[in-house]
Amino acid sequence: MSKKLISIVNVKDYVGQEVTIGAWVANKSGKGKIAFVQLRDGSAFFQGVAFKPNFIEKYGEESGLEKFDVIKRLNQETSVYVTGIVKEDERSKFGYELDITDLEIIGESHEYPVTPKEHGTDFLMDNRHLWLRSRKQMAVMQIRNAIIYATYEFFDQNGFIKFDSPILSENAAEDSTELFETDYFGKPAFLSQSGQLYLEAGAMALGRVFDFGPVFRAEKSKTRRHLTEFWMMDAEYSFLSHEESLDLQEAYVKALIQGVLDRAPQALDILERDVEALKRYITEPFKRVSYDDAITLLQEHEADEDTDYEHLEHGDDFGSPHETWISNYFGVPTFVVNYPASFKAFYMKPVPGNPERVLCADLLAPEGYGEIIGGSMREDNYDALVAKMDELGMDKSEYDFYLDLRKYGSVPHGGFGIGIERMVTFVAGTKHIREAIPFPRMLHRIRP
């Protein structure tokens, strides 16, 4: 067909006009003289209706019946050019309908495996390249896109410069036991866990920087919140205090939620997400509680009937049940601040007057989604950082460039990182992180 194509998402601008859409057949139904065809083109879903008498009237009996029969026999995922008149229809869940006047098959589809019936998780993951075409999976990807768009918009508006950190490195930013190792021309190299160390160099040059890209963690974990490859946004900034950093993180998360509400409302509707809850997370201030106060709260409530977490002492790290309880207790995203230095990273700056605690924060999302952001102030004193590395038995020669940052005009600075897939899962309201990335990499899955 030579007619100009429009996207389904824009059909509201063409009411009463004849348009042509390039799409795939998501489903079809009907009987006798009428056929319903559900169409998708990546931007949205839309229903077309074909009436046999209209085809006979327009094309004559023989050609009209032939064209109508083609529509009746369409298979799921057949690609088509479909032409028709856009009409408003309050009865339709899409709000509009296409009165089909012509249809041309582009590519046939036979025995499409991911049918509308229920399928097991392994089957769907084996066919992830096809499962992505389903209505809910498309909605999740649209939410992911809105979050990425809002990320770039937020940091641009707040004076940050995009600063690309390397994926290959010779040292670890976090836990050296969770590294993927590869050969780099005869030398060991590792896939990046985080761009943070390099971003600190960027912050000393440019003031405020962020990066966004894939990171890798060789975690042998099979939980619903872990991937071995995921996309991380890391931000670093000079001259901000700890409280100012928390303010920035809160503003960022609220901007992401607002971005999804603005750019992907239909996706939230498809997923039946509680939009009022998302709006409340924007309007209400996030809670801030110290690690020690959070431990005390957990101890005070551990005998409650609705709790199912293990007892913790001061100095213990939280598990997922503890994070869930804390965020649900406050009902909004909650910062837990000033964790013990004993289980946090070497580069975190101690709390003034309390060296056993560090100036850090984890942001816990409500509704059981747990940690979505981790951040801290960085140790900016050369001697203090060297002493900490010696205490941990670290090889300082592997971090010479990082130590240099403290030797030449060091300043107070900090940063934070967010796993985009965890944020997508939270905003979309889905149950498992594997649906928040196009092709998830997990402990026992590396294809498709």
UniProtKB/Swiss-Prot annotation:
Enumerate the transmembrane spans: none
Q: Subcellular location, in the record's words?
A: Cytoplasm
The principal location of this protein is cytoplasm
> What is the catalytic activity of this protein?
tRNA(Asn) + L-asparagine + ATP = L-asparaginyl-tRNA(Asn) + AMP + diphosphate + H(+)
Recorded hits in HAMAP family, A to Z, give: Asn_tRNA_synth (MF_00534)
Q: Which GO terms describe its molecular function?
A: asparagine-tRNA ligase activity; ATP binding; catalytic activity, acting on a protein; nucleic acid binding; transferase activity
Q: What is this protein called?
A: Asparagine--tRNA ligase
Spell out the SUPFAM superfamilies in the cross-references.
Class II aaRS and biotin synthetases, Nucleic acid-binding proteins
What biological-process terms (Gene Ontology) are attached? asparaginyl-tRNA aminoacylation
Q: Which EC number(s) does the record attach to this protein?
A: 6.1.1.22
Signal peptide (residue range): none
Q: Which GO terms describe its cellular component?
A: cytoplasm
Record's subunit section: Homodimer.
**Entry similarity comment:** Belongs to the class-II aminoacyl-tRNA synthetase family.
Q: Which CDD domains match?
A: AsnRS_cyto_like_N, AsxRS_core
Write out the entry's keywords from A to Z.
Aminoacyl-tRNA synthetase, ATP-binding, Cytoplasm, Ligase, Nucleotide-binding, Protein biosynthesis
